[in-house]
Swiss-Prot record:
Keywords: Acyltransferase, Transferase. SUPFAM superfamilies: Cysteine proteinases (SSF54001). The keyword Acyltransferase applies. The active site is at C71 (acyl-thioester intermediate), H110, D125. Its EC number is 2.3.1.-. GO terms for molecular function: acetyltransferase activity. Belongs to the arylamine N-acetyltransferase family. This is Uncharacterized acetyltransferase YvcN. It comes from the Bacteria. It comes from Bacillus subtilis (strain 168).
Length: 254
């Protein structure tokens, strides 16, 4: 077993992980702990924060400062954590499918993590908004379940990659994103971040948003509304004013 680094210690402390290691069997609980701790949010995009995606910078932003992030932050951080914990992982890129009306989103602007274990290869992702399986998804095609719905991977040639992540949240199987297994590097994540920050078709540079899964459901916030969805079906929606976003984010998400 590898000796636990300060980087891992800080991560484990932040998410409330009481073990001094993470095994493959631990990953469902570990990915839940990560998802419940770090919100999907875009303040850095709206503030035009200029930073490079490095292990040290993600450590500072997510563990020391009060930040969540988008896919390149959250899955970039997950990559470093899993690598440090002894897993064989690599960064990969995908293209989100925005629905039949809009088609494919900006090409190659979703970051995810490929993980190879003794019993097969998997996709792991804590940076796809609230669309999270909360466990490794087998590349071999088996379906996994989370409170959000069902997830599986299909090997299918598309114009955006040779695999697709499929989701069924109660309305039938739909494409979440297509991806390839070609390894990406930190420069690719920086490029992805620059596109998300500046491209006119980016969905994340128009207005503030935040979302996070919780043990009892999920929370979603825009500049005008804060909504709590509970797994039993109860919904609490409230209006927020100009200063309400930061206040609610600090109180409920961070």
């Amino acid at each position: 077993m590898i000796k636990m680094s300060d980087f891992l210690k800080d991560c484990f402390q932040k998410i409330g992980w009481e073990k001094d290691h993470v095994s493959f069997g631990d990953l469902p609980l570990f990915l839940k702990a990560m998802a419940y701790r770090f919100p999907f949010e875009n303040r850095a995009v709206l503030a035009k924060e200029n930073y490079k995606i490095t292990k040290e910078e993600l450590w500072r932003r997510l563990l020391k400062d009060q930040h969540g992030g988008l896919c390149y932050d959250l899955n970039g951080f997950l990559y470093f954590v899993l690598r440090e914990a002894g897993f064989h992982v690599k960064l990969i890129r995908g293209t989100v499918y925005a629905g039949d009306q809009e088609g494919w989103a900006l090409e190659g602007t979703h970051a995810a993590v490929w993980l190879s274990a003794e019993n097969g290869d998997y996709l792991v992702d804590i940076g796809f908004g609230i669309n999270l399986a909360l466990q490794p998804i087998p590349l071999s095609g088996e379906t996994v379940q989370s409170p959000v719905g069902s997830f599986r991977i299909k090997k299918e040639e598309t114009e955006k990659g040779s695999y697709v992540l499929l989701m069924d949240k109660g309305e039938g199987w739909q494409i979440g994103y297509a991806f390839t297994l070609e390894e990406s590097d930190l420069g690719d994540l920086d490029n992805m971040k620059d596109i998300i920050h500046s491209h006119e078709k980016s969905p994340f540079n128009k207005s503030l948003l935040a979302s996070k899964l919780t043990p009892s459901g999920r929370m979603v916030m825009s500049e005008r509304h804060f909504t709590i969805y509970e797994n039993g079906g109860n919904i609490q929606k409230s209006d927020i004013g100009p200063s309400g976003f930061e206040e609610k984010l600090n109180t409920h998400f961070l």
